[in-house]
A protein has these predicted regions:
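Amphipathic protein-protein interaction modules
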Residues: 30-63
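Intrinsically disordered, low-complexity Ser/Thr/Pro-rich tracts
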Residues: 4-7, 52, 79
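Amphipathic alpha-helices that form helix-helix packing interfaces
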Residues: 14, 21, 40, 44-47, ...
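Amphipathic alpha-helical interaction surfaces
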Residues: 20, 24-27, 46-54, 72-75
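N-terminal acidic leader/helix
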Residues: 2-30
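Short, compact, well-ordered microdomains
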Residues: 54-79
Length: 79
């Protein structure tokens, strides 16, 4: 799954990645560290905090539109 991330360059590829991620959870649940949505979301937040101060950080955080990310996550709740 992680190897697919670098090739995502369009909305369609992102949607396909989300669908693949959902399928991976269904098919390989035992490989997932986080088994609940709350654990999953908490660990995303934790990873962002840790990685943003890591020497390995290669993300340009100021270029990310966090409002859109928040909207995507919220719409998954209510749509």
């Amino acid at each position: 799954m992680i190897e697919k991330i670098s090739s995502i360059s369009s909305k369609e590829e992102f949607i396909e990645y989300l669908q693949d991620l959902a399928t991976d959870y269904t098919d390989n649940r035992d490989e997932w560290e986080n088994q609940t949505i709350s654990d999953y979301l908490e660990q995303i937040a934790s990873w962002i905090e840790d990685y943003s101060i890591s020497p390995a950080n290669d993300i340009e955080w100021e270029r990310i539109d966090f409002k859109i990310l928040a909207q995507l996550l919220y719409m998954g709740k209510i749509y």
